Amino acid sequence: MINDRPTQLRVNLDALLNNYNKLNSLNNEKIGLAVVKADSYGLGSKVIAEHLYQNGVRHFATATLEEALELKGVIKDSMVLVLGVINSQNVKYAVENNVSLTCPSKEWLEESLVHLQQIEGKLKIHVKLDTGMGRIGTSDLEELKEIDNLLDSEKIDFEGIFSHYSNADGEDDNYDNYQTENFERSLKIFTHKPKYIHIENSAGTVKYSNRDDQYNLTRIGIAMYGCYPSGNIEKLDKVQLEPVASLVSKVTHVKKIQAGQKLGYGVSYEAKQDEYIATVPIGYADGLLRRAQGFKIRVGSEECEIVGRVCMDQLMVRCSKNVKVGDDVLFFGEYSGQKVSVDEFAEYQNTISYEIFCCINKRVPRVYYKNKMEL
Protein backbone atom coordinates (compact mmCIF):
# COMPACT_ATOMS: atom_id res chain seq x y z
CA MET A 1 0.00 0.00 0.00
CA ILE A 2 1.33 3.43 -0.97
CA ASN A 3 1.86 5.74 1.98
CA ASP A 4 3.02 8.93 0.29
CA ARG A 5 1.71 11.46 2.79
CA PRO A 6 4.08 12.07 5.73
CA THR A 7 1.38 12.97 8.27
CA GLN A 8 1.12 10.39 11.08
CA LEU A 9 -0.28 9.88 14.55
CA ARG A 10 2.50 8.04 16.34
CA VAL A 11 1.54 5.92 19.35
CA ASN A 12 4.10 4.86 21.95
CA LEU A 13 2.89 1.52 23.34
CA ASP A 14 5.62 1.42 25.98
CA ALA A 15 4.44 4.74 27.41
CA LEU A 16 0.84 3.54 27.30
CA LEU A 17 1.64 0.42 29.32
CA ASN A 18 3.82 2.39 31.73
CA ASN A 19 0.96 4.80 32.37
CA TYR A 20 -1.49 1.96 32.96
CA ASN A 21 0.88 0.28 35.42
CA LYS A 22 1.57 3.53 37.27
CA LEU A 23 -2.13 4.29 37.62
CA ASN A 24 -2.97 0.73 38.59
CA SER A 25 -0.29 0.77 41.29
CA LEU A 26 -1.96 3.76 42.96
CA ASN A 27 -4.74 1.46 44.09
CA ASN A 28 -3.13 -1.86 44.99
CA GLU A 29 -6.36 -3.49 46.14
CA LYS A 30 -8.30 -2.54 43.01
CA ILE A 31 -8.32 -3.83 39.45
CA GLY A 32 -7.51 -1.34 36.71
CA LEU A 33 -10.06 -1.50 33.92
CA ALA A 34 -8.64 -0.12 30.66
CA VAL A 35 -11.12 2.14 28.88
CA VAL A 36 -10.67 1.61 25.14
CA LYS A 37 -13.91 3.21 23.95
CA ALA A 38 -14.10 5.39 20.84
CA ASP A 39 -11.29 3.40 19.23
CA SER A 40 -9.11 4.02 22.29
CA TYR A 41 -9.80 7.75 22.17
CA GLY A 42 -8.87 7.70 18.50
CA LEU A 43 -5.51 5.98 18.94
CA GLY A 44 -6.57 2.52 17.73
CA SER A 45 -8.30 0.11 20.08
CA LYS A 46 -7.35 -3.19 18.45
CA VAL A 47 -3.61 -2.66 18.70
CA ILE A 48 -3.83 -1.01 22.11
CA ALA A 49 -6.15 -3.60 23.65
CA GLU A 50 -4.03 -6.44 22.29
CA HIS A 51 -0.85 -4.87 23.67
CA LEU A 52 -2.43 -4.43 27.10
CA TYR A 53 -3.81 -7.96 26.98
CA GLN A 54 -0.38 -9.38 26.13
CA ASN A 55 0.91 -7.62 29.23
CA GLY A 56 -1.66 -9.05 31.61
CA VAL A 57 -4.62 -6.66 31.45
CA ARG A 58 -7.93 -8.56 31.58
CA HIS A 59 -10.56 -5.86 32.14
CA PHE A 60 -11.68 -3.46 29.42
CA ALA A 61 -14.53 -1.07 28.65
CA THR A 62 -16.03 0.22 25.42
CA ALA A 63 -18.84 2.65 24.65
CA THR A 64 -20.84 0.45 22.27
CA LEU A 65 -21.63 -3.19 21.66
CA GLU A 66 -20.06 -2.98 18.22
CA GLU A 67 -16.78 -1.84 19.76
CA ALA A 68 -16.86 -4.69 22.25
CA LEU A 69 -17.52 -7.35 19.63
CA GLU A 70 -14.73 -6.01 17.46
CA LEU A 71 -12.26 -6.37 20.33
CA LYS A 72 -13.34 -9.82 21.44
CA GLY A 73 -11.24 -11.33 18.68
CA VAL A 74 -8.02 -10.15 20.33
CA ILE A 75 -9.00 -10.24 24.03
CA LYS A 76 -11.27 -13.28 24.08
CA ASP A 77 -11.12 -14.30 27.74
CA SER A 78 -11.27 -10.76 29.15
CA MET A 79 -14.12 -8.87 30.74
CA VAL A 80 -15.39 -6.25 28.30
CA LEU A 81 -17.99 -3.86 29.68
CA VAL A 82 -20.14 -1.75 27.38
CA LEU A 83 -20.57 1.58 29.16
CA GLY A 84 -23.38 2.86 26.95
CA VAL A 85 -26.98 1.68 26.66
CA ILE A 86 -27.65 -0.93 23.98
CA ASN A 87 -30.94 -1.94 22.40
CA SER A 88 -32.35 -4.74 24.55
CA GLN A 89 -33.16 -6.69 21.38
CA ASN A 90 -29.43 -7.21 20.90
CA VAL A 91 -28.62 -8.76 24.27
CA LYS A 92 -28.17 -12.13 22.55
CA TYR A 93 -24.94 -10.88 20.96
CA ALA A 94 -23.60 -9.94 24.36
CA VAL A 95 -24.45 -13.36 25.78
CA GLU A 96 -22.96 -15.21 22.80
CA ASN A 97 -19.71 -13.26 23.03
CA ASN A 98 -19.41 -12.98 26.83
CA VAL A 99 -19.75 -9.20 26.82
CA SER A 100 -20.97 -7.37 29.93
CA LEU A 101 -23.68 -4.73 29.52
CA THR A 102 -24.75 -1.64 31.40
CA CYS A 103 -28.22 -1.85 32.93
CA PRO A 104 -29.54 1.75 33.08
CA SER A 105 -33.07 1.13 34.36
CA LYS A 106 -35.72 -1.32 35.48
CA GLU A 107 -37.50 -1.01 32.12
CA TRP A 108 -34.37 -1.96 30.22
CA LEU A 109 -33.81 -4.99 32.42
CA GLU A 110 -37.41 -6.13 32.03
CA GLU A 111 -37.19 -5.82 28.25
CA SER A 112 -33.88 -7.67 28.21
CA LEU A 113 -35.32 -10.53 30.27
CA VAL A 114 -38.03 -11.04 27.65
CA HIS A 115 -35.39 -11.46 24.94
CA LEU A 116 -33.20 -13.61 27.17
CA GLN A 117 -35.93 -16.23 27.49
CA GLN A 118 -35.40 -17.04 23.82
CA ILE A 119 -31.69 -17.86 24.12
CA GLU A 120 -29.37 -19.99 26.21
CA GLY A 121 -26.91 -18.54 28.66
CA LYS A 122 -26.78 -15.68 31.14
CA LEU A 123 -26.37 -11.98 30.54
CA LYS A 124 -23.66 -10.25 32.57
CA ILE A 125 -24.76 -6.81 33.72
CA HIS A 126 -23.39 -3.84 35.62
CA VAL A 127 -26.21 -1.77 37.12
CA LYS A 128 -25.62 1.94 36.53
CA LEU A 129 -26.48 4.30 39.38
CA ASP A 130 -27.02 7.98 38.65
CA THR A 131 -25.40 9.62 41.66
CA GLY A 132 -25.19 13.09 40.16
CA MET A 133 -23.93 12.92 36.58
CA GLY A 134 -27.49 12.96 35.23
CA ARG A 135 -26.66 11.00 32.08
CA ILE A 136 -27.79 7.38 32.38
CA GLY A 137 -28.72 5.15 35.28
CA THR A 138 -31.26 5.60 38.03
CA SER A 139 -31.24 7.29 41.41
CA ASP A 140 -34.74 6.25 42.47
CA LEU A 141 -34.45 3.93 45.47
CA GLU A 142 -37.77 2.22 44.77
CA GLU A 143 -36.68 1.47 41.23
CA LEU A 144 -33.43 0.06 42.56
CA LYS A 145 -35.39 -2.28 44.82
CA GLU A 146 -37.31 -3.51 41.79
CA ILE A 147 -34.06 -4.03 39.89
CA ASP A 148 -32.73 -6.00 42.85
CA ASN A 149 -35.81 -8.24 42.71
CA LEU A 150 -35.31 -8.83 38.99
CA LEU A 151 -31.77 -10.01 39.70
CA ASP A 152 -33.32 -13.21 41.07
CA SER A 153 -33.65 -14.35 37.45
CA GLU A 154 -31.43 -17.26 36.45
CA LYS A 155 -30.84 -15.44 33.15
CA ILE A 156 -28.90 -12.63 34.84
CA ASP A 157 -25.33 -12.63 36.13
CA PHE A 158 -25.08 -9.57 38.38
CA GLU A 159 -21.43 -8.86 37.67
CA GLY A 160 -21.15 -5.24 38.75
CA ILE A 161 -22.64 -2.00 39.97
CA PHE A 162 -21.18 1.40 39.20
CA SER A 163 -21.48 5.14 38.87
CA HIS A 164 -19.39 7.99 37.50
CA TYR A 165 -17.84 11.04 39.14
CA SER A 166 -18.73 14.17 37.17
CA ASN A 167 -16.37 16.61 38.90
CA ALA A 168 -13.47 14.54 40.22
CA ASP A 169 -11.09 16.67 38.18
CA GLY A 170 -12.28 19.80 40.00
CA GLU A 171 -10.57 21.69 42.78
CA ASP A 172 -12.73 20.57 45.70
CA ASP A 173 -14.29 17.31 46.84
CA ASN A 174 -17.76 18.59 47.71
CA TYR A 175 -19.61 17.18 44.73
CA ASP A 176 -17.54 14.00 44.81
CA ASN A 177 -18.58 13.50 48.43
CA TYR A 178 -22.20 14.11 47.48
CA GLN A 179 -21.98 11.47 44.76
CA THR A 180 -20.16 9.03 47.02
CA GLU A 181 -22.89 9.37 49.65
CA ASN A 182 -25.55 8.74 47.01
CA PHE A 183 -23.60 5.74 45.76
CA GLU A 184 -23.26 4.24 49.23
CA ARG A 185 -26.95 4.81 49.95
CA SER A 186 -27.94 3.05 46.74
CA LEU A 187 -25.57 0.14 47.31
CA LYS A 188 -27.36 -0.68 50.55
CA ILE A 189 -30.57 -1.35 48.61
CA PHE A 190 -29.15 -4.43 46.93
CA THR A 191 -29.46 -7.82 48.58
CA HIS A 192 -27.55 -9.37 45.67
CA LYS A 193 -23.82 -8.72 45.85
CA PRO A 194 -21.89 -8.09 42.63
CA LYS A 195 -18.34 -9.06 41.80
CA TYR A 196 -17.31 -5.49 40.95
CA ILE A 197 -18.15 -2.12 42.51
CA HIS A 198 -16.71 0.94 40.78
CA ILE A 199 -17.13 4.72 40.57
CA GLU A 200 -13.64 6.11 39.93
CA ASN A 201 -12.65 7.37 36.50
CA SER A 202 -9.13 8.56 35.63
CA ALA A 203 -9.45 11.62 37.87
CA GLY A 204 -10.90 9.60 40.72
CA THR A 205 -8.26 6.91 40.31
CA VAL A 206 -5.54 9.48 41.02
CA LYS A 207 -7.40 11.71 43.45
CA TYR A 208 -8.67 8.93 45.71
CA SER A 209 -5.75 6.53 45.45
CA ASN A 210 -5.72 3.95 48.25
CA ARG A 211 -8.90 5.35 49.76
CA ASP A 212 -10.43 3.04 52.33
CA ASP A 213 -13.64 1.92 50.63
CA GLN A 214 -15.44 -1.18 49.38
CA TYR A 215 -14.80 -0.50 45.70
CA ASN A 216 -12.61 -2.98 43.88
CA LEU A 217 -12.18 -1.65 40.35
CA THR A 218 -11.12 1.68 38.80
CA ARG A 219 -11.71 2.80 35.22
CA ILE A 220 -8.51 4.10 33.65
CA GLY A 221 -9.20 6.22 30.59
CA ILE A 222 -7.55 9.42 29.37
CA ALA A 223 -4.71 9.18 31.89
CA MET A 224 -3.59 5.90 30.36
CA TYR A 225 -3.13 7.80 27.10
CA GLY A 226 -0.74 10.22 28.77
CA CYS A 227 -3.05 13.12 29.63
CA TYR A 228 -4.09 14.39 33.03
CA PRO A 229 -7.87 14.86 33.28
CA SER A 230 -7.18 18.42 34.47
CA GLY A 231 -4.49 20.67 35.84
CA ASN A 232 -5.91 20.03 39.30
CA ILE A 233 -5.13 16.33 39.01
CA GLU A 234 -1.64 17.01 37.67
CA LYS A 235 -0.93 19.32 40.63
CA LEU A 236 -1.57 16.45 43.05
CA ASP A 237 1.78 15.09 41.82
CA LYS A 238 0.79 11.50 42.53
CA VAL A 239 1.77 10.09 39.14
CA GLN A 240 4.09 11.13 36.32
CA LEU A 241 2.38 10.34 33.05
CA GLU A 242 4.29 9.77 29.81
CA PRO A 243 3.08 11.20 26.47
CA VAL A 244 1.61 8.45 24.31
CA ALA A 245 0.45 10.13 21.09
CA SER A 246 2.36 12.45 18.76
CA LEU A 247 0.89 14.14 15.68
CA VAL A 248 3.68 14.66 13.16
CA SER A 249 4.23 15.55 9.53
CA LYS A 250 6.85 17.08 7.22
CA VAL A 251 7.20 20.28 5.24
CA THR A 252 6.17 19.77 1.60
CA HIS A 253 6.74 23.27 0.21
CA VAL A 254 8.57 26.48 1.16
CA LYS A 255 8.29 29.89 -0.47
CA LYS A 256 9.25 33.49 0.17
CA ILE A 257 6.51 36.12 0.14
CA GLN A 258 6.74 39.89 0.06
CA ALA A 259 5.61 42.38 2.67
CA GLY A 260 1.92 43.12 2.17
CA GLN A 261 1.25 39.85 0.35
CA LYS A 262 -1.90 38.07 1.48
CA LEU A 263 -2.52 34.35 1.63
CA GLY A 264 -5.07 31.70 2.51
CA TYR A 265 -8.83 31.50 2.25
CA GLY A 266 -10.50 34.80 3.02
CA VAL A 267 -7.03 36.38 2.68
CA SER A 268 -7.00 36.33 6.46
CA TYR A 269 -3.23 36.74 6.73
CA GLU A 270 -1.05 39.57 5.43
CA ALA A 271 2.73 39.56 5.70
CA LYS A 272 4.06 42.53 7.65
CA GLN A 273 7.50 42.05 6.09
CA ASP A 274 9.24 39.72 3.68
CA GLU A 275 8.66 36.26 5.10
CA TYR A 276 9.06 32.56 4.44
CA ILE A 277 6.00 30.32 4.39
CA ALA A 278 6.09 26.52 4.75
CA THR A 279 3.21 24.25 3.79
CA VAL A 280 2.34 21.12 5.79
CA PRO A 281 -0.01 18.37 4.47
CA ILE A 282 -2.67 18.25 7.16
CA GLY A 283 -6.00 20.03 7.47
CA TYR A 284 -9.47 19.92 8.90
CA ALA A 285 -10.33 16.85 6.81
CA ASP A 286 -7.77 15.08 8.98
CA GLY A 287 -9.28 16.43 12.18
CA LEU A 288 -6.95 19.38 12.68
CA LEU A 289 -9.57 22.07 12.97
CA ARG A 290 -9.52 25.67 11.76
CA ARG A 291 -9.42 26.99 15.30
CA ALA A 292 -5.75 25.89 15.44
CA GLN A 293 -4.89 28.98 13.37
CA GLY A 294 -2.30 31.00 15.26
CA PHE A 295 -0.90 28.11 17.30
CA LYS A 296 2.87 27.73 17.25
CA ILE A 297 4.00 24.26 16.19
CA ARG A 298 7.54 22.89 15.90
CA VAL A 299 9.22 22.78 12.50
CA GLY A 300 12.61 21.25 13.06
CA SER A 301 13.75 23.11 16.17
CA GLU A 302 11.80 26.28 15.34
CA GLU A 303 8.51 27.52 16.74
CA CYS A 304 6.36 28.40 13.74
CA GLU A 305 2.92 30.01 13.84
CA ILE A 306 0.06 28.60 11.77
CA VAL A 307 -0.93 31.50 9.50
CA GLY A 308 -4.00 31.87 7.34
CA ARG A 309 -6.98 29.61 7.74
CA VAL A 310 -6.37 25.90 8.11
CA CYS A 311 -7.45 24.36 4.79
CA MET A 312 -9.13 21.00 4.22
CA ASP A 313 -5.90 19.16 3.43
CA GLN A 314 -3.03 21.56 4.11
CA LEU A 315 -1.96 24.46 6.29
CA MET A 316 0.74 27.10 6.23
CA VAL A 317 3.18 28.33 8.85
CA ARG A 318 5.45 31.35 9.02
CA CYS A 319 9.04 30.17 9.31
CA SER A 320 12.64 31.25 8.91
CA LYS A 321 14.67 30.92 5.74
CA ASN A 322 16.39 27.91 7.31
CA VAL A 323 13.30 25.68 6.99
CA LYS A 324 13.52 23.20 4.12
CA VAL A 325 11.22 20.74 2.38
CA GLY A 326 11.29 17.49 4.35
CA ASP A 327 11.83 19.09 7.76
CA ASP A 328 9.99 17.37 10.61
CA VAL A 329 6.81 18.98 11.95
CA LEU A 330 5.35 18.36 15.41
CA PHE A 331 1.86 19.49 16.45
CA PHE A 332 1.77 17.72 19.81
CA GLY A 333 3.63 14.95 21.58
CA GLU A 334 7.34 14.14 21.32
CA TYR A 335 9.29 13.77 18.09
CA SER A 336 12.81 14.45 16.80
CA GLY A 337 13.93 15.87 20.12
CA GLN A 338 11.02 18.32 20.33
CA LYS A 339 8.06 18.30 22.70
CA VAL A 340 4.64 20.02 22.61
CA SER A 341 1.99 19.27 25.22
CA VAL A 342 -1.32 18.09 23.81
CA ASP A 343 -2.95 19.98 26.67
CA GLU A 344 -1.31 23.19 25.44
CA PHE A 345 -2.52 22.42 21.91
CA ALA A 346 -6.04 21.74 23.22
CA GLU A 347 -6.20 24.76 25.53
CA TYR A 348 -5.30 27.08 22.66
CA GLN A 349 -8.37 25.76 20.83
CA ASN A 350 -10.62 26.05 23.89
CA THR A 351 -11.05 22.29 24.17
CA ILE A 352 -9.58 19.23 25.92
CA SER A 353 -7.08 16.55 25.00
CA TYR A 354 -9.88 13.97 24.69
CA GLU A 355 -11.40 15.88 21.77
CA ILE A 356 -8.05 16.50 20.10
CA PHE A 357 -7.31 12.75 20.01
CA CYS A 358 -10.79 11.76 18.89
CA CYS A 359 -10.87 14.34 16.09
CA ILE A 360 -7.82 12.93 14.28
CA ASN A 361 -9.51 10.73 11.70
CA LYS A 362 -8.60 7.63 9.75
CA ARG A 363 -6.89 9.45 6.91
CA VAL A 364 -4.02 9.97 9.31
CA PRO A 365 -2.22 6.61 9.70
CA ARG A 366 -1.59 5.37 13.23
CA VAL A 367 2.01 4.26 13.57
CA TYR A 368 2.76 2.12 16.63
CA TYR A 369 6.12 1.56 18.21
CA LYS A 370 7.62 -0.09 21.25
CA ASN A 371 11.21 -0.52 22.37
CA LYS A 372 11.82 2.48 20.06
CA MET A 373 10.96 0.33 17.04
CA GLU A 374 7.99 0.71 14.70
CA LEU A 375 5.71 -2.31 14.57
Sequence positions of predicted segments:
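Active-site anion/phosphate-binding pocket segments in diverse small-molecule metabolic enzymes
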Residues: 2-12, 17, 67, 86-88, ...
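Active-site-proximal beta-alpha core segment in soluble small-molecule metabolic enzymes
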Residues: 2-3, 7-11, 15-18, 25-189, ...
